[in-house]
Amino acid sequence: MRINPTTSGSGVSTLEKKNPGRVVQIIGPVLDVAFPPGKMPNIYNALVVQGRDSVGQPINVACEVQQLLGNNRVRAVAMSATDGLTRGMAVIDTGAPIRVPVGGATLGRIFNVLGEPVDNLGPVDTSTTSPIHRSAPAFIQLDTKLSIFETGIKVVDLLAPYRRGGKIGLFGGAGVGKTVLIMELINNIAKAHGGVSVFGGVGERTREGNDLYMEMKESGVINKENIAESKVALVYGQMNEPPGARMRVGLTALTMAEYFRDVNEQDVLLFIDNIFRFVQAGSEVSALLGRMPSAVGYQPTLSTEMGSLQERITSTKDGSITSIQAVYVPADDLTDPAPATTFAHLDATTVLSRGLAAKGIYPAVDPLDSTSTMLQPRIVGEEHYETAQRVKQTLQRYKELQDIIAILGLDELSEEDRLLVARARKIERFLSQPFFVAEVFTGSPGKYVGLAETIRGFQLILSGELDGLPEQAFYLVGTIDEATAKAMNLEMESNLKK
């Protein structure tokens, strides 16, 4: 699907004063604007409020039309703070949706929801812009090839592999490592695949956004010397911003990714952290617009809003967008309408477990809860499929035996079950892995493990060849060869202590 980009300025900066209105009501981030009869703006048109505040400073607030109220009035949601706005201020209808800069000039830069750079590196060197509201590619333009997207993370590649051009959800409560995993994926994909990424920071902490930017500069994903050589564009709408900005920043990031796919014909990675905040912002806007809430207080249009975003994230015959979305799970409840609605759109789910994080196993990916539509023998091959199934069976049996172990102890198990438990504990530890982006905290250098090496490692554990090694040798290592080397070091250390 081809975008028809224009060569006008970004955001809502180029204004023709052809359709002036007046602010008649302000309630928080929601404005009511009156227009002359017969000159009503369309839904999703960008409006700009212009004037001066009480101390004479100029005001330039962009809004998006959400409702046509009758009596020549519209209701709009502000994309920035409404401090200093007063009734009677002039409003300009731009005649089109918000437009944002697209193309190679966006790489290495940080933008807000309006496509304005916020990194103090000057204006963006492009005149090409695209509207943030577009229809999804037509059915005939979609590409249906099935191929694996290797990440270099053992637990992901073996048990819940990602589809190239698919949608992946990272599920987990607060503080279990979603953002760290996303940072690692950006790092691995930029280095191993040379791919272009777009990162949409939706309603998350400003500190995390800053940390991510600094980490990318250090790792070379953003090239400090030559910004044009960077591999990622960043779009932020953080926690402190109005709900309108948080609701639309995901579309801004997606629009930039679509240009790389449709015009540059590239394979793109779109990271959204956090898709729950997109739903949350929509819920806030829905309440501010006076809509009746639905289940658990969410907006009645939850499925429609989610669908309009997710259906644009797809593979076409020109290129692909592989999307990895962090999903905050409120109170760790997967049946909450926000994560439940997200599930319907995903090809793979990576579920992060608080229990594994408490054990110190990172990434804390739950090997039994995480799923992928790609884990089929006809797609990944018999060897990969069989190994993954045996790993899951071993871990499932270990999970079933844990109650017996807690009450009666390991000694009451049969010889066969004791052996299975020992292997399961080795597998559990071997699923951990040192990350490049966590080197500063762990002191261990990061590891990228290829899929063939991952399969070989787990086959050796399952076959019983490594039954004699201590389980701590498998903790936070890359390949199985590193585990055997670590076991030898542990043995030497224990001999020295004797």
From Swiss-Prot:
GO terms for biological process: proton motive force-driven mitochondrial ATP synthesis. Keywords: ATP synthesis, ATP-binding, CF(1), Chloroplast, Hydrogen ion transport, Ion transport, Membrane, Nucleotide-binding, Plastid, Thylakoid, Translocase, Transport. It catalyses: ATP + H2O + 4 H(+)(in) = ADP + phosphate + 5 H(+)(out). It is an enzyme of class 7 (translocase). Its EC number is 7.1.2.2. GO terms for cellular component: chloroplast thylakoid membrane; mitochondrion; proton-transporting ATP synthase complex. InterPro entries: AAA+_ATPase (IPR003593), ATP-synt_VA_C (IPR055190), ATP_synth_F1_bsu (IPR005722), ATPase_a/bsu_AS (IPR020003), ATPase_alpha/beta_chains (IPR050053), ATPase_F1/V1/A1_a/bsu_N (IPR004100), ATPase_F1/V1/A1_a/bsu_N_sf (IPR036121), ATPase_F1/V1/A1_a/bsu_nucl-bd (IPR000194). GO terms for molecular function: ATP binding; ATP hydrolysis activity; proton-transporting ATP synthase activity, rotational mechanism. CDD domains: ATP-synt_F1_beta_C, ATP-synt_F1_beta_N, F1-ATPase_beta_CD. Transmembrane segments: none annotated. It is a peripheral membrane protein. Its main location: plastid. Gene3D superfamilies: 2.40.10.170, Bovine Mitochondrial F1-atpase, Atp Synthase Beta Chain, Chain D, domain 3, P-loop containing nucleotide triphosphate hydrolases. PROSITE patterns: ATPASE_ALPHA_BETA. ATP binds at G172, G173, A174, G175, V176, G177, K178, T179. It is found in: Plastid, Chloroplast thylakoid membrane. SMART domains: AAA. Pfam families: ATP-synt_ab, ATP-synt_ab_N, ATP-synt_VA_C. F-type ATPases have 2 components, CF(1) - the catalytic core - and CF(0) - the membrane proton channel. CF(1) has five subunits: alpha(3), beta(3), gamma(1), delta(1), epsilon(1). CF(0) has four main subunits: a(1), b(1), b'(1) and c(9-12). Produces ATP from ADP in the presence of a proton gradient across the membrane. The catalytic sites are hosted primarily by the beta subunits. Belongs to the ATPase alpha/beta chains family. This is ATP synthase subunit beta, chloroplastic. It comes from Solanum tuberosum. The lineage of its organism: Eukaryota, Viridiplantae, Streptophyta, Embryophyta, Tracheophyta.
